[in-house]
């Protein structure tokens, strides 16, 4: 239901969900009260999630604050480290502490904490085309750059990013060349992707972003995973 409301009202479900997570944490800490937010909002409450989706979609009451996103909301209430975001964009469901490559991708993505600008999860988790160990940071800078450049090329082609589960850059070049000209070789397509990425980065730099913005929330760097295969790890 909450996802439907997000789609119907032009709200990003990922950013909305992460912002609600921050609201629930602030509530459990006692920073926010039931009187302020209109409902008992213990973490995991489906009723609270639906309520927040409704008031955010309508811009009513506390929903106006939720609509500002987790970065502004948590800063307003004195706990900016609770915003799970990079460059103001909230993270999706992949924990950067247990998937080291995607953590670097979140930090360096030109548009913020986005998994679709370098989906290393394909290699680190789904093993497409081969598995790369997710728990180590070794080799991840090279992997992340390759994915980011390739994704930029794919996005510019108009193809759905999900096709990359089956196709690589050679397949993209093979389709572009007959349609657009023989100059679209594998090497040139790879260069196009890198150039697009660099132009985006140049735009960000001119807009005031610096290397300090290529970062992760403090808690991902200091609070270790408590259970599961990544137990004891932080983002490296």
Where are these regions (language model features)?
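Extended C-terminal regions of large enzymes
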Residues: 1-236
């Amino acid at each position: 239901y909450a996802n439907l409301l997000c789609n119907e009202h032009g709200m990003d479900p990922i950013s909305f969900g992460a912002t609600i997570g921050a609201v629930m944490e602030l509530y459990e800490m006692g920073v926010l009260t039931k009187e302020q937010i209109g409902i008992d909002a213990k973490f995991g409450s489906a009723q609270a999630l639906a309520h927040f989706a409704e008031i955010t979609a309508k811009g009513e009451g506390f929903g106006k604050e939720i609509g500002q996103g987790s970065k502004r909301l948590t800063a307003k209430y004195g706990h900016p480290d609770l915003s799970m975001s990079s460059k103001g964009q909230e993270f999706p469901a992949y924990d950067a502490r247990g998937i080291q490559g995607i953590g670097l991708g979140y930090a360096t993505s030109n548009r913020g904490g986005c998994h679709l600008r370098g989906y290393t999860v394909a290699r680190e988790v789904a093993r497409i085309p081969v598995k790369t160990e997710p728990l180590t940071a070794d080799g991840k800078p090279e992997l992340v750059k390759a994915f980011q450049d390739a994704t930029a090329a794919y996005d510019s082609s108009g193809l759905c990013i999900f096709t990359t589960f089956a196709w690589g850059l050679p397949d993209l070049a093979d389709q572009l060349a007959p349609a657009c000209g023989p100059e679209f070789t594998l090497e040139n397509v790879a260069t196009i992707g890198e150039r697009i990425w660099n132009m985006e980065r140049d735009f960000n730099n001119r807009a005031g972003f610096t290397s300090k913005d290529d970062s992760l929330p403090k808690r991902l760097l200091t609070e270790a995973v408590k259970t599961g295969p990544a137990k004891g790890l932080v983002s490296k």
